[in-house]
Each structure stands twice: as C-alpha cells, then as structure tokens.
C-alpha cells in the first residue's frame, strides 16, 4: 500500500500526521511511504529526516496519488480535486461541520477515517490528547484575552494576594470531559475560581471527588443553570462534543448578551460546529472577534499552535491503526479491530457513522454490513 503524508493547508496548522520515527515503522514493515515536501517543517522535522527513514519526498499533487493519505485536519477545498475512488483519507476530519466535503467524498467514492470518532473502551482514544492540549491552551487564551489591550475586561486572572486580596477570575467550563478537566487544572494553577457544568450524574460525582480540595464548583447541566452560571464567567469555555455529529446550539445569543462586557468566550468544539449560537470559526493568526460585548475565540485547530507537542501526541496514537490497515488491508483491519471500525465515517462513498448521517440528513449504513 502506498502511504502519503501531506502538508496541512489549514491556516496556522503546524502539525504533521506522521513523524520520521513512524515512517521507519512503516518502511520496515515493507510499505512505501511518500512525504510531501516540507510537510514536517512546522513540527521540527526536515525533509532529510524523513528520507533517512525511507520516505521519498514528493510534490503536493504526487502525494495525493497515494492509496492512503494521512492528514491531521480535513482536506482543504482546493484538495477535493485530488480525491479518487477507493482512496483512504485519515485525519481529524470533523465531517459533521461541512456537508460539501461529505458530498464530494460520496460522489468520488472515497473512504474517510476520522480519528476523533475512534472509540476504544468507551473513550475517544485518539482525540483525548488533542482535547487535553486544547483544554489547557483555552485556559491560557482566556487569561491572555482578558487583558485590556485585547479588548478584555482588563483583569489579571490570577488576582493579587501580596499584602492585598484582589480575587482572581472565574472560569465557567461547559462539559466535564478531558478538555474540561485540563482547562480546569490550568485555571486552578492560575489561581482562578472554576465552575464546571456537567450533565452526567456519575461524571458529576467523579468531578466532585477529583476537586474536593480545590476551588471548584460542579453544577448539574440544565438550561436554567447554564443561563445562571454563564453570567458569572470572566472566561467561558465550551467543551461539548458529540462524536461524529454536529452539536446543538446550547448557549444562546441571549445567554451571551447576559455575560460581563469584555469577558472571553471560547468554543473548543468549533471544528464540529460548536455549541454557541454566536460563535464562528476563526484562525490562529486572527483568532478573536467581539460580539454582544464579549470576546469570541473560535480557533478550530488549537493544537496546531503548539505543533511540536501535539504532533508527537497524535503520532503515538495513530501509528498502530495505520500499520494495521497497511498490513491487513482496510476491510480485514475493520473486521479485526472494533475501535478502528468506529472511525470509518465514509466507506467508498457510503456514510457509515450514524452521527454524521444525522447531521447532514444522509442515509446511514452499518460499516460491517457494507464491507461483507
């Protein structure tokens, strides 16, 4: 199987989907690997480093001729022209956010594997490290944009406690998963007060136990509680993600209007559509805008801003799946590996993820029925 590692075109995206070390694992297993020129530069990997591990450096167009194209984020619209029948595209594709790309993949007969929907032992195994990074960075960005020169309230989120008692900021975090706890931990490290809004009762108990000795309040998620707590936020971070599907707009414009002027609002799951009515995707180079008096931060690829860290994390997670596909062929790998099967969102043009199908009102096919 010919495997290609392509350079990301998304603005500000410095990650690469495969490290030189992982290229060596593929070539040692007898697979041919081509790497687009400068694909790894943003993560600190030169073309020579890939060549030394057995890869061939190629152009953008040549890379897209491969049987298996390994990416970080969804293909750019300029890359749709390279799609070909039965080609496999791997990455954090977040297809629920764009019907256009789904329809193009269906038209051509592409197979799309989305790392964020791979579930192993009940957990989003590949997404978790990226969620952790996004959560931590969101807390930092909240502090940064709280400063007056960025349009924020002009507050220091840590407060001041040398001979005075100026309280720190309040972070309200919507959701209680991996991204949420990582955001909370950074906020606590900054001496901020944290409120977590969570729906699941078991998770609420877990969070209460986890933060029993910390300045954290855990609140049951209801529309009424959300509306009440958001008013307290100096920084509001939404972490809600529904695997494979576009989430509902749970944070309404009226709720945003009720927030403090100059407060900061961040939606980590904006790459899947987001849960905030007033949010829209932004970029790492132009990350914020003001609406209803609130600073909105809508960067969909936050880990791309710290590529040296995040590339190592994602590459460690995806290589075993990629090797299995290459060694066995996709169909046998899907049959043998239930977790991998959950990542197949589109198989040869047929939608095989129920959340994705419902998001775009498309027909859904069970993956194991399709490949039999």
Curated annotation (Swiss-Prot):
Pathway: Amino-acid degradation; L-alanine degradation via dehydrogenase pathway; NH(3) and pyruvate from L-alanine: step 1/1. It comes from the Bacteria. The active site is at residue 94. SUPFAM superfamilies: Formate/glycerate dehydrogenase catalytic domain-like (SSF52283), NAD(P)-binding Rossmann-fold domains (SSF51735). Keywords: NAD, Oxidoreductase. NAD(+) binds at residues 170-200. Its EC number is 1.4.1.1. Transmembrane segments: none annotated. GO terms for biological process: alanine catabolic process; L-alanine catabolic process. GO terms for molecular function: alanine dehydrogenase activity. InterPro entries: Ala_DH, Ala_DH/PNT_CS2, AlaDH/PNT_CS1, AlaDH/PNT_N, AlaDH/PNT_NAD(H)-bd, NAD(P)-bd_dom_sf. It catalyses: L-alanine + NAD(+) + H2O = pyruvate + NH4(+) + NADH + H(+). Belongs to the AlaDH/PNT family. This is Alanine dehydrogenase 1. It comes from Staphylococcus aureus (strain NCTC 8325 / PS 47).
């Amino acid at each position: 199987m010919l495997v290609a590692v392509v350079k990301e075109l998304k603005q500000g995206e410095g990650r690469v989907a495969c490290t030189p070390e992982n290229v060596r694992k593929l070539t040692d297993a007898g697979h041919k690997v081509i790497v687009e020129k400068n694909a790894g530069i943003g993560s600190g990997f030169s073309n020579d480093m890939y060549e030394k591990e057995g890869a061939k450096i190629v152009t953008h167009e040549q890379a897209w001729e491969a049987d298996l194209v390994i990416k970080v984020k969804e293909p750019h619209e300029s890359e749709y022209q390279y799609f070909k029948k039965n080609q496999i595209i791997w990455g954090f594709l977040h297809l629920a956010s764009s019907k256009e790309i789904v329809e193009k993949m269906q038209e051509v007969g592409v197979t799309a594997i989305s790392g964020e929907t791979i579930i192993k032992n009940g957990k989003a195994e590949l997404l978790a490290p990226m969620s952790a990074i996004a959560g931590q960075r969101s807390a930092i960005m909240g502090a940064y944009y709280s400063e007056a020169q960025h349009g924020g309230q002009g507050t220091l989120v840590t407060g001041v406690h040398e001979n005075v008692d100026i309280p720190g900021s309040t972070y309200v975090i919507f959701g209680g998963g991996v991204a949420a706890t990582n955001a909370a931990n950074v906020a606590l490290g900054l001496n901020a007060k944290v409120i977590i809004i969570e729906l699941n009762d078991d998770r609420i108990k877990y969070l209460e136990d986890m933060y029993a000795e910390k300045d954290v309040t855990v609140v049951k998620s209801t529309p009424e509680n959300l509306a009440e707590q958001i008013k307290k936020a100096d920084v509001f971070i939404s972490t809600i993600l529904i695997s494979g599907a576009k989430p509902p707009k749970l944070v309404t414009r009226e709720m945003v209007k009720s927030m403090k002027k100059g407060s900061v609002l961040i939606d980590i799951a904006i790459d899947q559509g987001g849960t905030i009515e007033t949010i829209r995707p932004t970029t790492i180079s132009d990350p914020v805008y003001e609406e209803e008096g609130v600073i909105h931060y809508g960067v969909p690829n936050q880990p791309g801003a710290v590529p040296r860290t995040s590339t190592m994390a994602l590459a460690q997670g995806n290589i075993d799946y990629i090797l299995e596909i290459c060694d066995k062929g996709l169909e046998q790998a899907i049959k043998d590996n239930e977790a991998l099967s959950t990542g197949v969102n589109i198989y040869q043009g047929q939608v095989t993820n129920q959340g994705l199908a419902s998001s775009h009102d498309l027909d859904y096919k069970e993956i194991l029925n399709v490949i039999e």
